[in-house]
Swiss-Prot record:
One of its GO terms (cellular component) is ribosome. Coiled coil: none annotated. The lineage of its organism: Bacteria, Bacillati, Mycoplasmatota, Mycoplasmoidales, Metamycoplasmataceae. This is Large ribosomal subunit protein bL28. HAMAP family: Ribosomal_bL28 (MF_00373). The gene is rpmB. Belongs to the bacterial ribosomal protein bL28 family.
Length: 63
């Protein structure tokens, strides 16, 4: 299962991790995905959405 937000399509990003000596080594920043059951008109579905999307939907009253 891919680590992609169902709504925004945002996936993992790449960057560097830095040691105390400022040596850089590549790493991957994964999206914080959560499984949420959402009620559509045709029925309920389980979606994998990011916590940023979840926060926005809760603020707008969609969940």
């Amino acid at each position: 299962m891919s680590r992609v937000d169902w709504f925004r399509g945002v996936g993992p990003m790449s960057g560097n991790t830095r040691s105390h000596a400022m040596n850089a080594s590549r790493r991957k920043f994964n999206v914080n995905l959560q499984k949420v059951r959402v009620d559509f008109g045709s029925g309920k579905r389980t979606l994998r959405i990011s916590t940023k999307t979840l926060k926005t939907w809760r603020k707008k009253g969609l969940i």
